Amino acid sequence: MIETTDSLRDCLAPAKLNLFLHITGRRPDGYHTLQTVFQLLDWGDTLHFTRRDDGLITRSTEIADVPPEHDLTVRAATLLKAHTGSPEGVDIEIDKRLPMGAGLGGGSSDAATTLLALNRLWKLNLPRLELQALALKLGADVPFFVFGKNAFAQGVGEALDVVQLPPRHFLVVTPRVHVPTAAIFSEKALTRDSKPLTITDFPAELSCNTEWPESFGRNDMQQVVVGKYAEVAQVLRWFENVAPARMSGSGASVFAAFRSKAEAEAAQAKLPAEWNSAVTASLDQHPLFTFAS
């Protein structure tokens, strides 16, 4: 990251994985309650912020099918400006790497990085919990990225506790298909009654079991997505002879954990050439973590 008086450049908006995802119920308002472990990755979009004196919030990067007014970065900046009454403006540039509809949290992470970066650039000094409350207005996953540590999440994803996860390298494969989260949540076949866990149920296994992630829990959305999207099923079948794998979030990305980068890259080399993939390391903390207290 490069910081000047008027800009913050090369700000990573890290991807996330759901190491497991259990849906434990459905609230009267229609939102689902869940339990998951969020794992940060050292891979994601890169954002650049330049302060504007005219108070305008703009996005100078063209993104297909995402007009600026619908972009979560612009919405995050607008929300923060309204909340604080700041006279400042900003221009946002985005180097987009994470695919949309992939279960990697790309848009949510972009929004959180925007909140953290502008907290610094605009000299707002809002505490982390206040930023997390704002983040929840932008989406269920956004508070986690502001929280900035690997976490056990409950509720709709906003109740967060830090978890210590072993260092890993991951091979992430994303089929060329967009999976709409809302549509999967509305499926009648979706399991909504997984038995709630406690945070003490899994830390020891996470740190010592070589078969993680297959050894603990599951993704309750995976079976539904596999039934609707043959591309996701195909990737999971490919992994059966390579390493234990599962889907992240509502898909479409599928991941497997490896002890070393070399092992992950060796598996990646065997992939069909037409599949999108990345090898990435785990991350313990959001790169902009210190921009809130």
Swiss-Prot record:
- Kindly list the positions annotated as binding ATP: P99, M100, G101, A102, G103, L104, G105, G106, G107, S108, S109
List UniProt keywords, sorted A-Z. Answer: ATP-binding, Isoprene biosynthesis, Kinase, Nucleotide-binding, Transferase
**Catalytic residues in the record:** K16, D141
A GO BP entry is:
isopentenyl diphosphate biosynthetic process, methylerythritol 4-phosphate pathway
A molecular function (GO) term: 4-(cytidine 5'-diphospho)-2-C-methyl-D-erythritol kinase activity
Q: Which reaction does it catalyse?
A: 4-CDP-2-C-methyl-D-erythritol + ATP = 4-CDP-2-C-methyl-D-erythritol 2-phosphate + ADP + H(+)
Which SUPFAM superfamilies does the UniProt entry name for this protein?
A: GHMP Kinase, C-terminal domain (SSF55060), Ribosomal protein S5 domain 2-like (SSF54211)
EC number, as in UniProt = 2.7.1.148
| The organism's place on the tree of life at top rank | Bacteria
Pathway stated in the Swiss-Prot or TrEMBL entry: Isoprenoid biosynthesis; isopentenyl diphosphate biosynthesis via DXP pathway; isopentenyl diphosphate from 1-deoxy-D-xylulose 5-phosphate: step 3/6
Keyword Kinase attached: yes
Q: Which InterPro entries match?
A: GHMP_kinase_C_dom, GHMP_kinase_C_sf, GHMP_kinase_N_dom, IspE, Ribosomal_Su5_D2-typ_SF, Ribsml_uS5_D2-typ_fold_subgr
Checking Pfam families in the record gives: GHMP_kinases_C, GHMP_kinases_N
**Carries keyword ATP-binding?**
yes
HAMAP family per record: IspE
Summarizing the function annotation, the protein's role is: Catalyzes the phosphorylation of the position 2 hydroxy group of 4-diphosphocytidyl-2C-methyl-D-erythritol.
Q: Which family does it belong to?
A: Belongs to the GHMP kinase family. IspE subfamily.
What is the name listed in the Swiss-Prot or TrEMBL entry for this protein?
4-diphosphocytidyl-2-C-methyl-D-erythritol kinase
Native source species: Paraburkholderia phytofirmans (strain DSM 17436 / LMG 22146 / PsJN)
- Give the encoding gene's name: ispE
